[in-house]
């Protein structure tokens, strides 16, 4: 799926929201991610997965009693990966070894969501949900800019599942991956890296 397709999905989500009978609410969210910096040429630069935090504000709109809705968020996310530049003479000769590449993102995910509400009354206690949609990630700061070149905006495909508890708190597990490059190395500029990220978040809605 390319960037144009994800932009089209985002536009459709906005259009549906504008025309549907909806109820909305807002809240805050906290979470953590486990990120892999995946290189196109994996034999050149080995990497290790790393944890990072994420936090921000979130909102959702539900379309009546259908179970369908949309949600979005504004998040700070730190995505990291440990890259062993010292495995190659080109970087080792410059004094680099095992380096932690840190990317500080402002994320804007937009999801189409479905909650299964027909649980005979139990849905007020626990309600399963699934979601999918694009995520737009803006990069105000990244480490090791002498080694890597970073695009200012990344587009991801984001998906996941979870449960809503007591109509207030959600527990979500998800996965997203970069559609384009997250960065490429300057010495070998065809060595493209993409973020592949598992995450767990805990949104808490204020009403």
What are these regions, as identified by a protein language model?
Residues 1-29, 202, 206:
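Bacterial Sec-dependent N-terminal signal peptides
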Residues 20-24, 64-68, 117-127:
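Short loop/turn motifs that connect adjacent beta-strands in outer-membrane beta-barrel proteins
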Residues 22-26, 47-53, 102-108, 126, ...:
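Residues that define the transmembrane beta-barrel architecture of outer-membrane proteins
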Residues 28-32, 53-61, 74-76, 108-116, ...:
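Residues on the lipid-exposed face of transmembrane beta-strands in outer-membrane beta-barrel proteins
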Residues 33-37, 77-83, 137-141, 176-180, ...:
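Structural signature of outer-membrane beta-barrel domains
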Residues 38-44, 82-89, 142-148, 183-189:
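Outer-membrane beta-barrel translocator domains and adjoining extracellular loop/strand segments
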Residues 66-70, 120, 167-173:
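Repeated loop/turn-to-beta-strand initiation elements of outer-membrane beta-barrel proteins
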Residues 192-207:
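Outer-membrane beta-barrel "beta-signal"
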């Amino acid at each position: 799926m390319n960037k144009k397709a994800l932009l089209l999905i985002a536009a459709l989500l906005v259009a549906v929201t504008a025309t549907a009978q909806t109820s909305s609410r807002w809240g805050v969210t906290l979470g953590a991610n486990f990120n892999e910096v995946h290189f196109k040429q994996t034999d050149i630069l080995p990497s290790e997965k790393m944890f990072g935090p994420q936090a921000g504000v979130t909102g959702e709109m539900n379309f009546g009693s259908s179970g369908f809705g949309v949600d979005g968020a504004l998040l700070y996310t730190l995505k990291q990966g440990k890259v062993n530049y010292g495995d190659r003479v080109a970087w080792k000769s410059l004094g680099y070894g095992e380096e932690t590449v840190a990317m500080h993102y402002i994320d804007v995910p937009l999801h189409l969501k479905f909650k299964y509400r027909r649980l005979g009354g139990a849905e007020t206690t626990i309600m399963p949900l699934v979601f999918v949609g694009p995520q737009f990630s803006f990069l105000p700061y990244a480490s090791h800019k002498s080694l890597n070149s970073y695009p200012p905006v990344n587009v991801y495909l984001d998906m996941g599942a979870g449960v809503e508890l007591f109509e207030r708190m959600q527990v979500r597990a998800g996965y997203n991956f970069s559609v384009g490059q997250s960065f490429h190395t300057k010495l070998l500029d065809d060595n493209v890296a993409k973020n592949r990220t598992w995450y767990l978040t805990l949104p808490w809605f204020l009403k």
